[in-house]
């Protein structure tokens, strides 16, 4: 198994939900965690529950390419390198296409797709230069399933899944790993209005565990895709 102690990880969307749970899980493994997200206050609140020696906060909006580039540059400046990049930033807006909510469409495309691309544009050259690194992205089971109110959201998650499927082939034999995580319904602020038919939602920690599993595999093992569903 790969030892995570002492490694450096950037987590976007770290202020709540799966991002926050992943930050805590990595910090417990001895990882130096860079918390990135739009809410400085929420990031500070999260950091209070963690070992301050292992935490660095960089407020970042992934829809802003300049801020994403600055995030990675700042981490390189502070730590000298990055080992792990976990993209948890995401937006879900439930609506039918025929509701014509263009602002909602823009928000999902800008965050879920362009935010990932900006992140890859910033981090992959660093990983290529050092010949190692692991990029994890939160997709969703909605990448392969669609309801009458999730067409655009499902499309964005399908897009990022395909991006990662292609990226895995591009990065073969480079030492850089890629992992897509496809969660089912998770109990986060983003899903608080969904009753899920009375079924118990997954906890954010369940997804963090899946991410840790992928990150701790031996050097020759690349876990490309993990689907996690509630029973």
UniProtKB/Swiss-Prot annotation:
InterPro entries with a match to the protein in the record: NAD(P)-bd_dom_sf, SDR_fam
The keyword DNA damage is annotated on this UniProt entry: no
Tagged with keyword Glycoprotein: no
Binding locations of NADP(+): 10-34
Signal peptide bounds: none
SMART domains, per the entry: PKS_KR
EC number assigned by the record: 1.-.-.-
UniProt keywords, alphabetically: Oxidoreductase
Gene Ontology MF annotations: oxidoreductase activity
Active site: 153 (proton acceptor)
Binding site residues for substrate: 140
PANTHER family: DEHYDROGENASE/REDUCTASE SDR FAMILY MEMBER 11, DEHYDROGENASE_REDUCTASE SDR FAMILY MEMBER 11
Protein family according to the UniProt entry: Belongs to the short-chain dehydrogenases/reductases (SDR) family.
Name listed for the protein in its UniProt record: Uncharacterized oxidoreductase SH0585
Organism: Staphylococcus haemolyticus (strain JCSC1435)
